[in-house]
Structure formats: structure tokens, C-alpha cells
Curated annotation (Swiss-Prot):
Belongs to the tetrahydrofolate dehydrogenase/cyclohydrolase family. This is Bifunctional protein FolD. Homodimer. Its EC number is 1.5.1.5, 3.5.4.9. It comes from the Bacteria. The keyword Amino-acid biosynthesis applies. The keyword Cytoplasm does not apply. NADP(+) binds at G166, A167, S168, I232. Pathway: One-carbon metabolism; tetrahydrofolate interconversion. GO terms for biological process: L-histidine biosynthetic process; methionine biosynthetic process; purine nucleotide biosynthetic process; tetrahydrofolate interconversion. The gene is folD.
Length: 284
């Protein structure tokens, strides 16, 4: 068996085209274009790349993108004041603060300062709570994008044994909630998990988000499983690899995401979808 590749790049491009058409229709109807504020604190190279991609994606679909690049030494109070300003700006539908933040700034305080109706990253406790209660509105972008990828396979998720490896607030925990909502019997694995191999081998649907190159051996993959690899790791050779040993896993799986070109583009597409949703449902 050779797995079908789930082409996140192509699916994300299709979503962007649809969003662009909706923005054009809004303008023709005399409505304003959706606005996204992107806040970057410091000069972390990876964060700069991610932020650049998000800003370009905004422009591509016709959103208004407002950029705030702040120095590393920016105080927590100054960052919170900027968020307050964006909260009150009627031209801004979504506020994105690029994580991680410098050590002197408390992430949870920043996330909770963003108004829930402008929390297009889906990190605010209100929005995570709505997902937990099975009434999601603004959903965490990476898990939301992953659900779109899974849907693209045409496989019915109800009753599947799903395993999530990684329990971060950004991916693992909201991913578990998304899979429960999709009717899966879901196991979340983390650093205290015993016998990880046994759990992975049982997975009809495997999602790995740990940030360790080739962490899951390919031979652990159950024949016919769907494999979603969230990791993106650069080896010393410069090669980008995921958290799953791709070549061997692709021999066992029915569907698999590549790295790069799998989950990454979908995270940005979901961010754009959330921003349009916020504009249409909260701010029009």
C-alpha cells in the first residue's frame, strides 16, 4: 500500500480563492473588507517567517492587514495597551499575537486580553470552552485546518480510534476536542504516556505534534491509517522533516500529509476563514 498524499498546499489555495471571491462580493455590496492586526514582539527568525506568510496571505485574499512589529523589550503593559486599541478599532476583525512571546510577558494574560470575538487564533478560554461544549465558533487554527484535511479524504470519522501525540494548548488539546466532536474515540498521548507504541499502532487516525524529527517510527503505523504530521523540523543537512518517519509510514497509511506542504498552509487558511467569520458574524 502506498498512501495518498493529502495536499495541504492545494486545499489551502482553494480556500483562499473562495475567500477572495467572498471579499470581492463584500466590496461590491458596499461592505468593508475584513481586517487583521498582526502583532510581533521581538525578532525571532521563525516568528518573522510565520508572520510574513500570514501578512502575504491577507493581502492575497484582499483583507486589510495591519502590522505591529514591537521590540523585544516591549513591556507587558504596552502590549496589552496595543491590544486594547485593536479591540476598539472597528476596522479590525481579528487580532493575532505571534507566539512565543519574550519571557517577561505572560502569554495567558495576552491571550485573555484579546476580545473573544476578535480571537481569530482560537486560543481564548471562551472559544476553547465553546469547542469543549460542542458549540464552536472561532476555532484553533491548526486543529481546524487538520479537520479540513481529514474531511478531504472522504473517510467517515465516526467511530474511528484517533490518537493525538502531543498535548499543547495550540494543537494537542483543541485537536482532541475537535476529534471528539467528529465522533472519534480519542486518546491523547503526552510525556507521561506509557507504551506509546501500543497506542499508536491501534490508531485509525494519527495526529502527531511534538516537534521532534522522525519521532514516530513508520512501522508503528496501522495499515490503512490516516496520518497527519504537524511537526516541521530542520535537520543539520537543511532538510525539513516532520515528527513521523515519512517514507516508511507512507507504505502503511492510506492517507498522509507531507512536510512541508501539509498542515502548515492549512493553519494560515483557517486563520483567514476565522477572520472572515468574525467580520460577517460579529462586526457587520
Amino acid at each position: 500500500m502506498t498512501a495518498q498524499i493529502i495536499d495541504g498546499k492545494a486545499i489551502a489555495q482553494s480556500i483562499r480563492k473562495q475567500l477572495s471571491a467572498k471579499v470581492t462580493a463584500r466590496k461590491e455590496a458596499g461592505k468593508r473588507v475584513p481586517g487583521l492586526a498582526v502583532i510581533l514582539v521581538g525578532a525571532d527568525p521563525a516568528s518573522q517567517v510565520y508572520v510574513g506568510s500570514k501578512r502575504r496571505a491577507c493581502e492575497e485574499v484582499g483583507f486589510l492587514s495591519q502590522s505591529f512589529d514591537l521590540p523585544t523589550e516591549t513591556s507587558e503593559a504596552d502590549l496589552l495597551a496595543l491590544i486594547d486599541k485593536c479591540n476598539e478599532d472597528p476596522s479590525i476583525d481579528g487580532i493575532l499575537v505571534q507566539l512565543p512571546l519574550p519571557d517577561h510577558i505572560e502569554e495567558s494574560k495576552v491571550i485573555e486580553r484579546i476580545r473573544p470575538d476578535k480571537d481569530v487564533d482560537g486560543f481564548h478560554p471562551y472559544n476553547v470552552g465553546r469547542l469543549a461544549q460542542r458549540i464552536p465558533v472561532l476555532r484553533s487554527c491548526t486543529p481546524m485546518g487538520i479537520m479540513t484535511l481529514i474531511k478531504s479524504t472522504g473517510v467517515d470519522t465516526y467511530g474511528l480510534d484517533a490518537v493525538v501525540v502531543g498535548a499543547s494548548n495550540i494543537v494537542g488539546r483543541p485537536m482532541t476536542l475537535e476529534l471528539l466532536l467528529a465522533g472519534c474515540t480519542t486518546t491523547t498521548c503526552h510525556r507521561f504516556t506509557r507504551d506509546l507504541e501500543d497506542k499508536v499502532r491501534r490508531a485509525d487516525l494519527l495526529i502527531v505534534a511534538v516537534g521532534k524529527p522522525n519521532f514516530i517510527p513508520g512501522e508503528w503505523i496501522k495499515p490503512g491509517a490516516i496520518v497527519i504530521d504537524v511537526g516541521i523540523n530542520r535537520l543539520e543537512s537543511g532538510q525539513l522533516v516532520g515528527d513521523v518517519q515519512y517514507d516508511v509510514a507512507a507504505e502503511h497509511a492510506s492517507h498522509i500529509t507531507p512536510v512541508p506542504g501539509g498542515v502548515g498552509p492549512m493553519t494560515i487558511a483557517s486563520l483567514l476563514e476565522n477572520t472572515l467569520y468574525a467580520a460577517e458574524n460579529y462586526h457587520d
